[in-house]
Amino acid sequence: MSEEALGELSGYIRERLGDAIEEANLAYGELTLCVPVASLIGVLTLLRDDVQCQFVNLTDISGVDYPQREKRFDVVYQLLSPRQNQRIRVKVQADEDTLVPSAVPVFFGAEWYEREAYDMYGILFSGHPDLRRILTDYGFEGHPLRKDFPLTGFVEVRYNDELKRVVYEPVQLRQEFRNFDFLSPWEGTDYVLPGDEKAKTN
């Protein structure tokens, strides 16, 4: 879609929604609307139902974590209008305690997307019919896509041959320190390493 057409769409949406749009950005051939949490459902409903918009397909909901911000999460909704051949992105900001209204009443397919955002980031959705984890295991601690989640996780899940079942154990780093040999003859060095049978001798 052309920049001009996206600019016209942005102007039309801002005219219809007024203060419900905090910011509209047009960059790289994509339109992004930033809206307050309280206006989210109204904005999504208008984008779906308005004849000029017809964004009837919710293709994704994702989270983005900015731990240095007061409202650390962006919740990003990707919408598609097959009739208009247009895509649009809607963003809201939330902190760990903010309840984002569930988009399930507007787009039924939002149910699993919101469960994934909850599971991976801990983003809370009010009015969701079944807000529970969807990807991680039962009893999983934390939310693995948050920037402050440890790379190793909190527990190690593995199959124990002796017990014939899956076991959960505290993470143990098998190799706390590793001494790398940076003086390798394969790196084009001119010196001979002790014990290197292939080293050149003068």
Curated annotation (Swiss-Prot):
Q: Does the keyword Ubl conjugation apply?
A: no
GO cellular component terms, alphabetically, are: plasma membrane
| Domain of life from the UniProt record | Bacteria
Keywords carried by this UniProt record: Cell inner membrane, Cell membrane, Membrane, NAD, Quinone, Translocase, Transport, Ubiquinone
Q: Which GO terms describe its molecular function?
A: NADH dehydrogenase (ubiquinone) activity; NADH:ubiquinone reductase (non-electrogenic) activity; quinone binding
Coiled-coil-forming residues are none
Catalytic reaction annotation: a quinone + NADH + 5 H(+)(in) = a quinol + NAD(+) + 4 H(+)(out)
* PROSITE patterns recorded: COMPLEX1_30K
Subcellular localization(s) per the UniProt record: Cell inner membrane
A Pfam family found in this protein is Complex1_30kDa
Does Ribosomal protein count among this protein's keywords?
no
The Swiss-Prot or TrEMBL record describes its family as follows: Belongs to the complex I 30 kDa subunit family.
Q: Which PANTHER family match?
A: NADH DEHYDROGENASE [UBIQUINONE] IRON-SULFUR PROTEIN 3, MITOCHONDRIAL, NADH DEHYDROGENASE UBIQUINONE IRON-SULFUR PROTEIN 3
Q: Which proteins does it associate with, and in what oligomeric form?
A: NDH-1 is composed of 14 different subunits. Subunits NuoB, C, D, E, F, and G constitute the peripheral sector of the complex.
Q: What is this protein called?
A: NADH-quinone oxidoreductase subunit C
What is the species listed in this Swiss-Prot or TrEMBL entry? Brucella abortus (strain 2308)
* Source species taxonomy: Bacteria, Pseudomonadati, Pseudomonadota, Alphaproteobacteria, Hyphomicrobiales
Gene symbol of the encoding locus:
nuoC
